[in-house]
Amino acid sequence: MKKITLFCLLAAVMLFAASCRHSEKTIVFQNYEYEDNPFAETDDTVGVQFSIKIQLPLLEKATEAQRPLMQAMTDSLLTRLLEPYYNGKAPDQAIKDYCDSIRSEFNDWALLDDPTESGMPNYQWIQELSLVPELETEQMLVYNGSIYAYTGGEHPSTTTILFLFDLNTGKQLTEQELFNWAGDAPNSESYNAFVELMKGMIRKMCDATDDFTADDIDWDNVAPNGNFKVTKDALVYHFDVYEITNTNAGPIDIVLPNHEVKQFMKEGTVLYNYWFKK
């Protein structure tokens, strides 16, 4: 039995304290959900599983002044998560197009075998996409995005995409804006020192766990990858499995305390001010 639901739900309203330019910032999260799980457990569908689940709490335009900022952040989120199916469309239409494409791909794949000839096939296709708002400050918002896919085999694929937004501009903050080793005039000495900081933190992780060792790390590829978020007191770089680790180590988060990162930062950014100008 096919069941698809697509709806919008006002999920949360958060008030941010006054900034130097705005007396109040009101951010409304509108939750877009889509579920498709068409195969009931019957004799005809034993071993067949197909499901899509999407949960995207996107930013809504609470005021006219916020409209371009919220739209810019939505564009950044959906372009990364739903590519190539988002091209300025309404979010619900982009989500539907994305899911229809996955369903079509599953149908083509499932028809490759004839269950009447090969016995009951074990078709499993699970796709889940989610966003979680994490750190929320007066001037920044962190999102943690995850794309989970399992189409058979030994293990699923999970891709984590992190977003750090400047709420004053609607821009996604990148290494170029934040660090002195990036941008128009990169500092190679600073960059190399930053890489060594990352490697040093991984070595500490290896020493502190029995789950993996230094032999499970591809040390030549340890470097800033642009996939980072921030917490109240740390910078966190995320690497999916195979980027710098094997399946034994799995995905890895490199947590760098802000006092260690300070020497590499450009002053005056919203992140620098949040950490060091309180």
Name each model feature, range by range.
Residues M1-V28:
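Bacterial Sec-dependent N-terminal signal peptides
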Residues C20-K278:
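Compositionally biased intrinsically disordered regions enriched in Thr/Gly
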